[in-house]
Amino acid sequence: MFSILNKLGIIWLALANISNCDNSKSGHKSIPKYNVKYYHANIPKDFANRFVELNDKIVENGSFEILGIDGQPSKNQYLCFTPNPNTAVNVSIESAQRNTRSKEIENEPKSEAEIIQRGVEMIEKSFSRKDCVFAYGSNGGYWTLGYCYGDKVVQFHENLQHFVATGKHKPEYPDYIYVLGRFKGSSKKPTNLDNQSPWASNNLDLSEFTIHESSIISDATAKNEQSRFLQHTLYDGEICDLTRKPRSIDIIYKCDPNHRGRIEILDQQEIKTCVYQMVIGVPKLCSLDEFRPNKVEDQIIDIDCKLIDQTNKVKADKLSYQDFFYYTDDIPSDNKIFPIPHSYKVSLNNYNLSPCGHGFYLGQSKLPINSPSVYFNFRHILVFNDQYHSSSDLLEKLGKMLKVCVGNKILSPHIENKRQSLLSWNDTFILWFELYDFYGSFISLVKVSRDGSKEELELKLRLINPETMLDQDGDLVKVPEFDAPNNAWNFQKFSKGKGSALDSTNNDKNNKATAENDKQYQSTSTDIVTVTVTESLETTSSEDGTEEVSNEMVILKKLADKLGMTDINELHQAIEDLDIELEVQHDEL
């Protein structure tokens, strides 16, 4: 079998790229899909070679192959066993839900108009004409989106400091709230962030809705899902500077199986100039069989790949192919400097991945982990699906991602009303993540520190080698002792509000014994990369003492919006490089 592994291109998470067709509809047998599992098993090199020599004798069972998973033969090599798909055990996706739903639909046939009516009724019951639903951090944190039922859809630049302090949304520039589309009969009052709907009821016009179906791959588990959604197009938005036509937006209402009991804006994109699409998860739609994802049964074949220990010189005696399966993970171990070694590799299809922006995903294990390391059993990981050219480049990308996720995506260890609260800029914390690429290969440890007592929205970031505990500058970092409040094992320290958890160890009498050891790190640790995530504009003081945005920065803001640039400073630098002088006239405003 040269080999299914090579045919897959060694892109293990790309199960989504392996056929996502619903073959059951055409009457054909489902195409096998491959679920690659990694084990840090340390098989001796000679044993690995002997397993490969067994291939001619085990054709009915499958085949072994030695592969440099990352495309670098000299780097980490794995011994992989690919079962013969004709004799492999059929590990199928449970399809009882699909069969039950299919029978219900067969017994109760419904027209498209009936399905639309039922779906729209759920939408009408879900929304309030008094409130708006917001999503902070769209387009890399540049826009905040607002969906106001019965009124409008808007995007605006968030006043981040106000949001952090109050939890309420406020535009940085009140005159620049862009309306992407309006409901029919909506208010023509000057636009603000309130729901200004004049409607007397929640009733929608059924003729404005269309129903669609889409095939998607759920997570990385090779589940084909046929999903229905309702589309509603809103017109009459702000005039677009480029097309000179009103903006419009397609609203996609769907059942999100991973919903958290509340309506959420799941996605928004500009599909062409000044024409947008917004996807909204409506939990009540999940109560209708017609809108729940239709899971299709597939044949899943596991491919086991186990790390080869190139330094182990033990010679193999007599082997059978079954011996391969007795080699399991021999790490993590608390006996190491850090529980995770630099050579570690994860099977990303074992993780639920939640997008964080800028190519980063937050990963949580789907199944319980039972290892000697309690840290390893409960921690979350970061996954990066992009390229970087240097450690400073990677740190910059991390900073941009965290700017969006702190206060919006990452949960803190604090429990409030039986629910975990979001990590806030007012919190003080030391947070650790293992960072992996989209092959599942380890990149670096990431240490994130925040002092919530500071007004500046700053984070201190370090990239650390877990085997040497040296950071990107070669400075030694102390091996952490995790407080892990409420079993949140990514948190070394945490203090809710504007405390100073970073210095809390000074008051811990149990740490007196380690005081001498701490000194060695003080002498070797120097500069730490600091990422400032505020993007303040130049201001001038008016006669009454209030601050106003300078005319120059307003012009830059307008230019950046028209050019589609997300960083005003980048535009400013480009102008300086071209030796162009900005002349601001009052009548230009």
From Swiss-Prot:
Instruction: List ligand-binding residues for a mannooligosaccharide derivative.
Output: W143, Q155, D241, R247, E270, Y276
In its keyword annotation, does this UniProt entry include Endoplasmic reticulum? yes
List every stretch annotated Disordered: 497-520
Where is this chain glycosylated?
A: N17, N61, N90, N426
User: May I ask which residue range the UniProt record assigns to the signal sequence?
Assistant: 1-21
List the Gene Ontology MF annotations in alphabetical order: carbohydrate binding
The entry assigns this protein to a family as follows: Belongs to the OS-9 family.
Protein name per UniProt: Protein OS-9 homolog
Task: State the organism named in the record.
Answer: Debaryomyces hansenii (strain ATCC 36239 / CBS 767 / BCRC 21394 / JCM 1990 / NBRC 0083 / IGC 2968)
Q: Which gene encodes it?
A: YOS9
